[in-house]
């Protein structure tokens, strides 16, 4: 019985985040794949290799969707004038926000699975680790959008702040040309693509063991950073008087 109640609560959270047509949102990422497919068909020299799957084909649409979910989790309650109701949820408002996060995560998983199948058959096979890398970036920016939405008490302001940080990420990495292992979009498979056409040193690392160490460092650091941002976002949202001021 408790499982049924929890599932119903998560379903309700999903409806609050993305309305009754939430099932359509994963399909909003398909135009991006269609555009990339058109580009590769129009210019055969623009080949998308396995190393580009994580960022170009999966990471970009998933991150956009994650940012939308993130801005809706807490700031959506403010813009909908329903935040005061969230504070009265049995078990605390965090229970509702965690349910929203989990429902958004499930939608991201479904979207990634759908995109991965299409990419595999329409573009190129790719390593399974690329799925985690793309999901990591989307979850990071989802949590960041949630926290900034709570900080600025606005969906729009939170989204603008998140987009600015995403743009800075793009500038630092040359929009995927350079890989920095302390950023959420770190893609080790681009190094492997580079080393496949030259030598390992030219690919940017000295050994596969070093590349593995960089990848593990990135994954652990991003998990810790996401946990810290999530905690700060909830701390801000729990300041009830400030959050409700002016509503």
Language-model regions: role of each:
Residues 22-29, 58-60, 220-226:
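Hydrophobic H-region at the start of alpha-helical membrane spans
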Residues 29-66, 70-73, 98-170:
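Secretory targeting signals
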Residues 9-13, 18-19, 78-88, 108-118:
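Hydrophobic, membrane-facing alpha-helical anchors
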Residues 1-10, 46, 93-94, 123, ...:
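Juxtamembrane loop-helix boundary motifs flanking transmembrane segments in multi-pass membrane proteins
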Residues 10-14, 96-97, 132, 237:
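Hydrophobic alpha-helical elements at and bordering transmembrane segments
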Residues 43, 164-247:
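Terminal transmembrane helical anchor/hairpin motif
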Residues 1-27, 242-246:
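Aromatic- and glycine-rich beta-strand/loop motifs that create alpha-glucan
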Residues 71-105:
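Helix-loop-helix units of permease transmembrane domains in multi-pass membrane transporters
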């Amino acid at each position: 019985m408790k499982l049924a109640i929890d599932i119903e609560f998560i379903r309700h959270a999903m409806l609050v985040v993305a309305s009754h047509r939430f099932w359509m949102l994963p399909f909003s990422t398909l135009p991006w794949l269609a555009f990339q497919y058109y580009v590769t068909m129009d210019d055969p020299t623009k080949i998308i290799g396995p190393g580009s799957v994580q960022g170009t084909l999966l990471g970009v649409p998933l991150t956009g969707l994650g940012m939308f979910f993130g801005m809706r989790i807490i700031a959506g309650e403010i813009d909908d004038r329903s935040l005061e109701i969230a504070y009265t949820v049995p078990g605390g408002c965090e229970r509702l926000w965690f349910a929203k996060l989990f429902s958004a995560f499930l939608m991201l998983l479904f979207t990634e699975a759908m995109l991965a199948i299409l990419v595999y058959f329409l573009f190129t096979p790719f390593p399974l680790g690329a799925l985690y890398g793309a999901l990591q970036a989307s979850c990071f920016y989802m949590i960041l959008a949630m926290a900034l939405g709570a900080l600025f008490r606005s969906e729009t302001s939170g989204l603008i702040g998140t987009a600015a940080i995403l743009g800075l990420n793009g500038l630092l990495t040359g929009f995927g040309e350079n890989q920095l292992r302390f950023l959420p979009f770190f893609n080790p498979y681009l190094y492997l693509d580079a080393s496949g056409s030259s030598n390992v040193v030219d690919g940017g690392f000295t050994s596969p063991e070093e590349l593995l160490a960089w990848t593990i460092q990135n994954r652990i650091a991003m998990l810790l950073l996401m946990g810290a941002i999530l905690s700060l976002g909830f701390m801000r949202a729990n300041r009830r008087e400030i959050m409700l001021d002016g509503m």
